[in-house]
Amino acid sequence: MGWGTGPPSWSELERVLSGRPGRTDPEAMYPGDGGDSPAWSRKREPYLAEPIRPVDRPTVPYAELHAHSAYSFLDGASQPEELVEEAVRLGLEAIALTDHDGFYGTVRFAEAAKEWGIATVFGAELSLGVARPAPRRSARKAARGRGRAVRYAATPEFEHAAAPDSAPRTGEPDPPGPHLLVLARGQEGYRRLSREIAAAHLAAGEKGVLRYDIDALTAAAGGHWHILTGCRKGHLRTALADDLAAGETGLPRAEAALRDLVERFGADRVSVELTHHGVPADDERNALLIALADRVGLPVLATTGAHFAGPEQRRRAMALAAIRARRSLDEMAGWLAPAGGAHLRSGAEMARLFAACPDAVANAVALSRECAFDLRLIAPQLPPFAVPDGHDENSWLRELVLRGAARRYGPPHANPPAYRQLEHELEVIATLGFPGYFLVVHDIVSFCERNGILCQGRGSAANSAVCFAIGITNVDPVANELLFERFLSPERDGPPDIDIDIESDRREEAIQHVYARYGREYAAQVANVITYRGKSAVRDAAKALGFSPGQQDAWSKQVSRWTGVGAETGTDIPEQVLRLAADLEGLPRHMGIHSGGMVICDRPIADVCPVEWARMAGRSVLQWDKDDCAAVGLVKFDMLGLGMLSALHYMIDLVREHEGVEVRLHELDLKEPAVYEMLSRADSVGVFQVESRAQMATLPRLRPREFYDLVVEVALIRPGPIQGGSVHPYIRRRNGTEPVTYDHPALENSLGRTLGVPLFQEQLMQMAVDVAGFTAAEADQLRRAMGSKRSPERMRRLKERLYRGMAELHGITGEVADRIYEKLYAFANFGFPESHSQSFAALVFYSAWFKLHHPAAFCAGLLRAQPMGFYSPQSLVADARRHGVPVHGPDVNASLAEATLENGGREVRLGLAGVRHIGSELAERIVAARVEHGPYTSVLDLTGRVELTVAQAEALATAGAFDSVTGPSGAERSGGRRAALWAAGAAARERAHLLPGTGPAADAPALPGMSALELAAADVWATGISPGSYPTEFLRARMDELGVIPAGRLLEVRDGSRVLVGGAVTHRQRPATAAGVTFLNLEDETGMVNVVCSVGLWTRYRALAQSASALLVRGRVQNAEGAVSVVAEHLQLLSLGMGSRSRDFR
């Protein structure tokens, strides 16, 4: 299928940026999307048709009107694009997508069909509930009126609330309940069907449960649907089977079912569906159906009832059926489809199968022509934004901009360029009809500001002076000479894209504000399709093949997160499991929810795409992902949770509370040398965006001295790693080891600030303006065309325009022109927007400032904001200790629910919520009871005030949270943590309904104390953190004997020396641009070590490297310019004596 892939190697990109000769086919090298992605994008690129060899025989006209894709979730085995491609290969005139209870795959289906020029029909197979005795009609109407009004304001006349619920579609080989196959007759039919699917999903108030009312469906159709009698689960086939089982040759039940459909939907809106999968029983059944159709006066229509594209996918379809039923393939014997299979067939084959009834094939074609339409016709708009009297959207936006400009820029005469830019942007926004979009985003940002929620716009929105003036972004694009057209231009084929970063712990408030302001009917969150990846594919493949749960789990743990299943080597996973898992990989498994994407419509969203409940309370979610929404024209707003904003807010609060200092981020001195000196030492654990292995290797080489250096640093690591001796050409030029050169003097204007090396997407646009005379809007077209490869023809025209402009304006031709083009093409895919780097660089400085000046608050703020960032809480605490910050474990009389400060803000106290089995809610209750009634005096006192399970009480004791408690006899204190654990178990068993003293004895017998290693192991088990030590401390004597170099001393080791290092594995990382190289981060009590593992070494030690919690590594030191790493030659297991878990990344 024609979807884009990932980036090339770092070495290839570095060659291009350095201007060295090499490959001359950039189109083959640099796939990407030209978007705001840091390296390569997870954005789905537009579908591109690839050559298909059609069937080698004369075709009979045919249209397939009953087909399920993989978006029937475990009941279809082909991607929508695969169905379209096979339909094209078979010469079909049209194809319908009729997935179960949704339009999940319709956009991908429509995009592929548009590319191939095949007509599309849209429908769904509805899963009706099991029938139950119905109340009188009037009572049912009343019940429906009450049903969902509180939660979802759907059309009241089509309520479903009193209907029976559908049965779960998983866990059973043949889920009970009838199906109804509905085809939308054009755009209006689609709208009505979408609304009814949404109403059914929402009526039951629970994700995955549907509640269709057949009477409501009847009323909703209005002549805009066409009903096929469906598969064996349809009303007609079910009734027919009942008649045959009862020996009723007159088929009374089947005839009644068919006449009921006619009465409900009309004789011209029902067709009797015939299927034939190549078995004799199909002929007998079809003959009976044809006779029934003649009796009732209905046409017949042939379908394949396809659940996969071609015969080669039948094995995959059978496996998915077993997975859906939670059974093995052996256990599914008798339930699976006949050997012929439900796959697409050509018109010629269908004509042969239905030779006795040729009209059935012709009728399919005729109906497809009546129903087909282009999905793009449904594109909605934003709702009108409520503005004050006397204003429209344009005038109100202008008013807000002028107010903000006065604050940001002063009066017009003080900054004429800024006001000229604002006027230009307002004209473009008005021309494109987007003022409402900016007003919506401004409203969200204003809500956050009013409620004390940290937020900022980022990405290409920071190129806009309008966004800066009205407070959406905090980067001045006029002062920084950023191109507005990178964000918005007259030629743009869609609304702008503004990402808002909101502190993650309060993002839900902003989301609920949008629901409250626009109504749940007009706003919804965007879906995230959860697809099969390596581990889940292996687990489910093993399950389908009948292996035990333990074996499934063991094999899934052997799968790398970086490679496809098909590339796995060195495992003991059976070949048959790997083969099937590779076949499943990439298929959708279920729907999730996007991290922050929301859409807002001028009409009920369900008119465009069905909505359903998410797992999270209070969230409704579209059936489309962000790429689907963009393709159809839904206006999406990204409210992204950013953990660092939460952490910064916590840091500000902690410093105010414990040190009496009010920190205002915008007032910090961005020129403070001490902050840059700290970062130049790569002392950046926990600092936003510059804490990764690659960033920490770059900081000592770059040695940032001013704010713009941080802007560069944020962008510099994109798209890939600084590997081995390979140094970014910008750093070589910055440090004077390589001269600053330009391929042509005309490039100095665009590349001078970055020493002749393109780093930002805005630069490539400026390059096109300077060397070829492009307008800024044309330059953005070039960037986007290069980035997404949307149209080869468009790319060819722009390339010709670029070469012609270079020749005419500056006489640039030949090799120089090719080099300029190659740089443009390479960086169109991977360049970071400078506006984005500017936004993030501020957060780099703010977080670094806290680390330097308030290290305890910095640590506690990061702990409160978990999960976030690159490092685990254990590593964050270890780094705080290395900076002289004492860290104390959780204590029932000293801790809050979350981490806090003590001793004037100089020490950190861990929170109770981080203790195993406790969580935030219970921790808050423990703290509240202490605040209300005073400190706890014993374990029994605590369990008397706050009910705990035995597991919870014992986890608190294991964490040392009772260390400050003295019991009546002092036994808890004298016996140490073991005595507290004894007392905790006994106290937790005391209950109000039991007589005092009838439970186990709370006083512990004499118990031995715990060693320092045992205490650290207990801390790690209970909280994941050993606050007073690091696990390697207890092995140091043995490690010294072995000659292990502590991490903190590696900088002293000469480059090229062979060393032995060791520590806990905190990260495993294999960037897509690293050509298979894997990086490990080891940590000991003195610091961290970056370990480089070649492809060969990783293959040799794969099982150990992938699973070990700690390692000894022998290798060669690379020590240059303050950055040190070890190139591994040998790996060996290091036993810590306690748990440790790594964070693995791409």
Curated annotation (Swiss-Prot):
One Gene Ontology biological process: DNA replication
Enzyme Commission numbers on file: 2.7.7.7
GO cellular component: cytoplasm
UniProt superkingdom: Bacteria
Key word DNA repair present: yes
Keyword annotations of the record: Cytoplasm, DNA damage, DNA repair, DNA replication, DNA-directed DNA polymerase, Nucleotidyltransferase, Transferase
Annotated region described as Disordered, given as residue ranges: 1-43, 154-178
Main location class: cytoplasm
Catalysed reaction, written as an equation: DNA(n) + a 2'-deoxyribonucleoside 5'-triphosphate = DNA(n+1) + diphosphate
Keyword Nucleotidyltransferase: yes
Family annotation (SUPFAM superfamilies): PHP domain-like (SSF89550)
The protein's name in its UniProt record: Error-prone DNA polymerase
Entries under Pfam families matching the protein: DNA_pol3_alpha, DNA_pol3_finger, HHH_6, PHP, tRNA_anti-codon
InterPro entries in UniProt: DNA_pol3_alpha_NTPase_dom, DNA_pol3_finger, DnaE2, DnaE2/DnaE/PolC, DNAPol_HHH, NA-bd_OB-fold, NA-bd_OB_tRNA, PHP_dom
